[in-house]
Each structure stands twice: as structure tokens, then as C-alpha cells.
Amino acid sequence: MKLSSLWSNAFVINVAIALYAETAFLSAPKLKIDCRPYLDSNDKCTREYHPVCSTSGKTYCNKCTFCKALRLDTMSSSLLWIKITFILALVVPFYYGTTFAFSKEARRQPDCDKYRTFPNQCTREWNPVCGTNGFTYSNECVFCNAKIAAKEKIDYRHFGPC
């Protein structure tokens, strides 16, 4: 045989191996295991050794232990989502209750009539109100007192700083 034909045969074989190596050597047939017989939570698995290899690379001693582990893994991920949902259900209302307080209150204007009877007796709380004069008042009471003193020339723009 000529040397050139040996090299060409070797080249063809190497190309074939390179093209089909993944399917020929790496991928094993993926079997779908029916876990329905093992779904009852009271059943215990036997200790017989008929190994089942999972896609995660872990080997289980038989179908029953594989299905139990799969069910527990599915349950733990579902429990994780339940925990996340529960935490979000607790945290989100507190966060948005404080964050959107101004947008909820922006729909109603301060009732300045209740401050006419006791003028200039305001608390020092910080719940800012923006007036149409561009000034930020520390709270509704201070705003209403300024509005009454200015003979209603100042009007309410929105809750929050200007």
C-alpha cells in the first residue's frame, strides 16, 4: 500500500471520529423511567442493586430510590417557591405601603378646616407637603397654618417634598 493512501485513510478515520465522537462515546441513551408505581409515600424501597444513573450524574441503587429522590427534589423546589412566595407576601406590603404612601395620599387634599380651631399647635412629625408656592412644609398642620395665614393664597400641590 502506498503511504498516501494510508494517510488519506487515517485522515478520513480521524474526521469520522471527530464528527461522531460525541454521539458515539459521550451520549448514552436517555431512558424515561416510569415513577408511578413508586409514588405512594408509605412504600419503602428495597435494597436490590439495579443502578440507575440520573442526568445530574448521581447513581441510585434502583428505580425506587431514584423516583423517591426525584419526588423529594421536586418537593424541595416546590417548597422553596412556597417559602419565597410567603416571604414576598409578607415583605412586599410593608415595602410598598411605605413607598407608595405619598402616591395614595396625593389623591386627597389636606383638610385645613380641622386646624382652624387650634392654630399653630402642630406636632414636629416629618410628613412633608408641597405647596403651590414651591415651599415644602414639614407636615399637613404646618401647611394648613401657612395657608390660613396667607388667606388661602397658597394651595396644595402634592404630598412629599417639592
From Swiss-Prot:
**Protein name (record):** Serine protease inhibitor Kazal-type 10
Q: How does it sit in the membrane?
A: Multi-pass membrane protein
Source species: Mus musculus (Mouse)
Q: Does the keyword Cell cycle apply?
A: no
Keyword Transmembrane on this protein?
yes
* Assigned GO CC terms: membrane
Give its localization: Membrane
Looking up InterPro entries in the UniProt record yields: Kazal_dom, Kazal_dom_sf, Prot_inh_Kazal-m
Report the transmembrane regions from the record. Answer: 6-26, 80-100
Which keywords does this Swiss-Prot/TrEMBL entry list? Disulfide bond, Membrane, Protease inhibitor, Repeat, Serine protease inhibitor, Transmembrane, Transmembrane helix
Biological function: Probable serine protease inhibitor.
* Residues covered by the Kazal-like domain: 29-86, 106-162
**Tissue specificity as recorded in UniProt:** Expressed in epydiymis, in the cauda and corpus. Also expressed in brain.
What are the annotated disulfide bridges?
35-67, 45-64, 112-144, 122-141, 130-162
Concerning PROSITE patterns, the annotation shows: KAZAL_1 (PS00282), KAZAL_2 (PS51465)
Locate the site labelled Reactive bond: 124-125
Gene Ontology terms, MF aspect: serine-type endopeptidase inhibitor activity
